[in-house]
């Protein structure tokens, strides 16, 4: 089930984010990420039956997978995005320039990937950015396993910033750090976060992204961000057994 991650609005300053709180939010989401990875595994056909062991070693153990998870997600995505979204001019506006930008960003493919991510994970994230060395905007769908939105602690739950991160382990030193990209309305933080006995340490670079709004958009499949087959996994397991 979707978990709202919050950051206290009182004292919030996008120019001075509290690194220890960012680190804590990442560790909380990293726990949730294991559930999201399991949903992706079911879509890819990696089901519980593949790890099944018979009590009687002489009994057959076929481990056959009927991938209903993929069938459900692909069918739902096909119904939702089988026909690309159409954008039309109105009497009040001319969106030809916008449509040209959408064509350049291959927005139909991004929409389709977002729809599939919603079917699998119950959520999707789209990142808007300027192409390197250019002023044109581009768009891409990014992995929900490594992305989350952070809201304020008010009743309205207004978005404050988005985080895209990945974990880096050093087995020789038995240490773990997180590479994180944090986007507020105006700033892009590049952080390297690690926890030590003396607290959270980090390297940080901050640059303006000049978009005037958080450049990561969150889409939810429903209010609770439940995937299309998430509540059918026990039935899928029973069928495959």
What is each model feature region?
Residues 1-139:
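Extended, helix-rich architectural segments
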Residues 3-12, 16-17, 113-241:
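Structured, contiguous alpha/beta core segments that scaffold functional sites
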